[in-house]
C-alpha cells in the first residue's frame, strides 16, 4: 500500500467514544436486569432459539460482480453524498446509479453531525432503488446506532435533536415503535459478501465462533425486545463485541494478525473490512497482509471531510479517492 498522504485538513483528533457505562441502579434491579440479558444470551445459544426476528437468510451474498463499501458518515450528508457519487453509487440527487453493485455501509451514520434524518432516508431510498436495478444495499449497525437505542446521547448534537423536533420526539422516533427505530432494528451487525466480512468494529474470535446468523439474530432480538436500560448489559454490545472492538485497527500486528486469522478461519473467509477507528490521514488502512482493511477515513467534516470508498471486484481491491484510484490488492 502506498504511503499515506496528508489529509486536506488536520483536525485535532476527537476523543474516541467509550462503551456506555453500566448505569448504577438498586441491587434488585441490577440482578434482574443484568441476569435477564445474560440468560437471554445463553438460552439462545444453548437451545438455538430463533425468536423474532428471523435472520436475513442471504447473509452470505455470492452473486455480485462489484462491491463498494463506505465507512462512518457521522451526520454529514454533503460529504456522504460526495463519496457515494465519487464511488458511482448515487447521482447528485441521491438516486441509485450503481446497477447490480452491492453497497455496504459499515455503520455510524448518526452522531457528531446534524444530518441524521437525511442520511437514514437516503439509505432507505437507495435500498429500495438498488433492488429494482438488481443491486443491493447492506446497511450495518455501528456502536453509535446502538448507543442511541440505549438513549446514550453523549455524541448527539443540538442540531440533530432540533431536526427531530426536540429530545422527547427524538426518543420516540428512535424507539421500538418509531419509524427510524423499527428500520434500524432490522439491520445486521455482520455481513459476509463473497468471503469478505463486513462490520463496524471488528470480529474477535470469541464472537466469530458464534457464527454470523447467530450474531445477527441475537442483536436484532435484543434490540427488538429489551428496553434501553437493559441493552447496557448485553455482552454482544460490550467493549470486545463486534461494534466496539478496535484490536485489528490498533494492536501490534505481530499479535493481532494471529487473532484475525483465527476469526477468519472460523468464518471460512479471507478478509475483514471494518470502520469505527478514524484514519485522519484520509487513507484506507491495510493491515495483516491486506486481510483487514479499515475504511473509516473521517468522511464527516468533524474529522476533516476526507473522502474515500473501497471497491472490490473479484480479487482486485481498490481504494477510491477524489481524482485517483489506488490498488490495495489484486
Model-derived regions, located:
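Feature recognizes metal-dependent phosphohydrolase scaffolds
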Residues: 2-330
Amino acid at each position: 500500500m502506498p504511503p499515506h498522504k496528508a489529509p486536506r485538513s488536520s483536525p485535532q483528533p476527537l476523543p474516541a467514544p467509550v462503551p456506555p457505562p453500566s448505569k448504577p441502579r438498586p441491587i434488585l434491579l441490577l440482578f434482574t436486569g443484568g441476569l435477564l440479558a445474560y440468560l437471554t444470551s445463553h438460552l439462545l445459544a444453548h437451545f438455538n432459539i430463533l425468536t423474532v426476528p428471523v435472520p436475513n437468510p442471504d447473509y452470505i451474498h455470492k452473486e455480485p460482480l462489484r462491491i463498494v463499501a463506505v465507512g462512518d458518515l457521522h451526520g454529514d450528508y454533503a460529504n456522504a453524498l460526495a463519496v457515494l457519487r465519487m464511488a458511482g453509487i448515487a447521482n447528485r440527487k441521491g438516486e441509485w446509479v450503481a446497477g447490480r453493485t452491492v453497497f455496504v455501509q459499515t455503520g455510524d451514520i448518526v452522531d457528531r453531525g446534524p444530518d441524521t434524518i437525511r442520511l437514514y432516508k437516503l439509505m432507505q431510498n437507495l435500498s429500495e432503488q438498488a433492488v429494482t436495478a438488481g443491486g443491493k444495499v447492506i446497511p450495518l449497525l455501528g456502536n453509535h446506532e446502538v448507543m442511541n437505542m440505549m438513549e446514550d446521547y453523549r455524541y448527539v448534537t443540538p442540531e440533530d435533536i432540533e431536526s427531530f423536533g426536540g429530545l422527547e420526539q427524538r426518543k420516540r422516533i428512535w424507539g421500538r415503535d418509531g419509524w427510524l427505530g423499527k428500520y434500524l432494528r432490522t439491520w445486521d451487525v455482520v455481513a459476509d459478501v463473497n468471503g469478505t466480512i463486513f462490520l463496524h468494529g471488528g470480529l474477535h474470535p470469541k464472537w466469530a465462533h458464534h457464527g454470523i446468523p447467530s450474531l445477527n439474530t441475537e442483536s436484532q432480538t435484543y434490540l427488538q425486545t429489551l428496553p434501553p436500560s437493559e441493552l447496557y448489559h448485553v455482552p454482544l454490545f460490550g467493549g470486545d463485541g463486534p461494534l466496539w472492538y478496535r484490536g485489528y485497527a490498533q494492536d501490534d500486528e505481530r499479535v493481532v494478525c494471529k487473532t484475525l486469522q483465527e476469526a477468519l478461519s472460523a468464518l471460512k473467509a479471507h478478509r475483514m473490512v471494518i470502520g469505527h477507528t478514524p484514519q485522519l490521514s484520509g487513507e484506507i488502512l491495510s493491515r495483516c497482509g491486506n486481510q483487514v482493511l479499515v475504511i473509516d477515513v473521517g468522511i464527516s467534516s468533524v474529522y476533516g471531510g476526507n473522502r474515500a470508498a473501497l471497491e472490490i471486484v473479484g480479487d482486485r481491491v481498490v481504494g477510491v479517492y477524489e481524482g485517483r484510484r489506488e490498488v490495495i490488492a489484486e
